[in-house]
């Protein structure tokens, strides 16, 4: 097996990492009292870590598999550099999401080291582009062996907490929602990410502006809007068949091939990046792949987290989405649970959720007091 092939298929998985020894982490806002940390476990196709500690508070993490091969990957990394949260929702196969899980954070660390660890929008954007170029190189090297690798891609949602600022970078249609305390004690749901999906009218106009000479840049097909009638998302890592003409030809499947010459990339790997100064009323963040948001509103998700203990928050959100998926199909949740992967995809997508609770005292000083290079490194299981 070639070195590139070994590199591509290396497992996006580590033993579930040691966490920062932080007894104060339970005192932050949002959710119920933490009551300590809970371990990871499995329940059928569901993997979860009920409660963990990062250097700015607590987090909860869960993923459920629906596809024959799990296409979602995710990670939480925390240390003296701040905190990095990633959700990678693959499509066409698992390879791009696994590659991003293995490489995006490493590129982020290498690039931020050039500026003594200072994090900026440029730092994050460069990390995305370096990851895209790395995956493109593998697609090129393996073109003769695995041409369909050119049709694999992944959405990317990244949150970086650096000092008292949250950076959110997004490609595709995963979403992060902030639970923010109001003056009267309630919580509001504030979406912080941009979704690059052709079903969004703003994205259709963006694509038309970028491709004024192509009346077929977005096509309504099978009940949804798609870029060139093929794919719903307009930005991703991977999907080289939509970005480089040398990968849009035989032997990839006819359904992926564009009839007319490709004058410019049809999709982008440049993320939309938002910077949000953290406020004491910012209680928690819900990072999730679009499989969750197909079934839960932003407000409902925030309500669920707010009204229950922290432990198991991510798992609780996934189960709420599954209950809703079952209701839509007029079936019982207990019957949905009996359906095996692959067939399960007809009822819901792979779903990844990471809930990050914000302890503002710890966030303010954590990057100073942390003495280890990386004190938390958690990645979701590769398969269930």
Swiss-Prot record:
Give binding positions for Mn(2+) 2. Answer: 89, 290, 349
Q: What does this protein do?
A: Dephosphorylates and represses plasma membrane H(+)-ATPases (PM H(+)-ATPases, e.g. AHA1 and AHA2), thus influencing negatively plant growth and fitness. Promotes the apical hook maintenance of etiolated seedlings.
Q: What is this protein called?
A: Probable protein phosphatase 2C 42
Q: Which organism is it from?
A: Arabidopsis thaliana (Mouse-ear cress)
Question: Where does the record place the PPM-type phosphatase domain?
Answer: 58-358
Cofactor: bound how, per the entry note? Answer: Binds 2 magnesium or manganese ions per subunit.
Alphabetically ordered keywords of this record: Hydrolase, Magnesium, Manganese, Metal-binding, Protein phosphatase
Which cofactors, by name? Answer: Mg(2+); Mn(2+)
């Amino acid at each position: 097996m070639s070195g590139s092939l070994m590199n591509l298929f290396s497992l996006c998985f580590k033993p579930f990492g040691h966490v920062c020894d932080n007894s104060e982490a339970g005192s932050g806002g949002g959710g119920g009292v933490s009551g300590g940390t809970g371990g990871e476990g499995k329940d059928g196709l569901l993997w979860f870590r009920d409660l963990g500690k990062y250097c700015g508070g607590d987090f909860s993490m869960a993923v459920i598999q629906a596809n024959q091969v799990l296409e979602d990957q995710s990670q939480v990394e925390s240390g003296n550099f701040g905190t990095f949260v990633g959700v990678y929702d693959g499509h066409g196969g698992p390879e791009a999401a696994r590659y991003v899980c293995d490489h995006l954070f490493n590129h982020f660390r290498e690039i931020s080291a050039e500026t003594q660890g200072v994090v900026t929008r440029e730092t994050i954007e460069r990390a995305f582009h370096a990851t895209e170029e790395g995956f493109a190189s593998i697609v090129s090297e393996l073109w003769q062996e695995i041409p369909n690798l050119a049709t694999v891609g992944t959405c990317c949602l990244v949150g970086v907490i650096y000092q008292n600022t949250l950076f959110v970078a997004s490609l595709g249609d995963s979403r992060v929602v902030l639970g923010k305390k109001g003056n009267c004690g309630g919580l509001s749901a504030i979406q912080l990410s941009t979704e690059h999906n052709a079903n969004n009218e703003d994205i259709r106009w963006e694509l038309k502006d970028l491709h004024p000479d192509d009346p077929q840049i977005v096509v309504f097909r099978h009940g949804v809007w798609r870029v060139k009638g093929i794919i719903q998302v307009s930005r991703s890592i991977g999907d080289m068949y939509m970005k480089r003409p040398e990968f849009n030809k035989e032997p990839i499947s006819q359904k992926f091939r564009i009839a007319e010459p490709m004058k410019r990339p049809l999709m982008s790997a440049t993320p939309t990046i938002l910077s949000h100064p953290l406020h004491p009323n910012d209680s928690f963040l819900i990072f999730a792949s679009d499989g969750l948001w197909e079934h839960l509103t932003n407000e409902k998700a925030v309500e669920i987290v707010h009204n229950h203990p922290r432990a198991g928050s991510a798992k609780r959100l996934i189960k709420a989405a599954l209950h809703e998926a079952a209701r839509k199909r007029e079936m019982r949740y207990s019957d949905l649970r009996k359906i095996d992967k692959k067939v399960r995809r007809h009822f819901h997508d792979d779903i990844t959720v990471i809930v990050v609770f914000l302890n503002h005292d710890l966030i303010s000083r954590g990057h100073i007091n942390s003495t280890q290079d990386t004190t938390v490194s958690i990645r979701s299981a590769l398969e269930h």
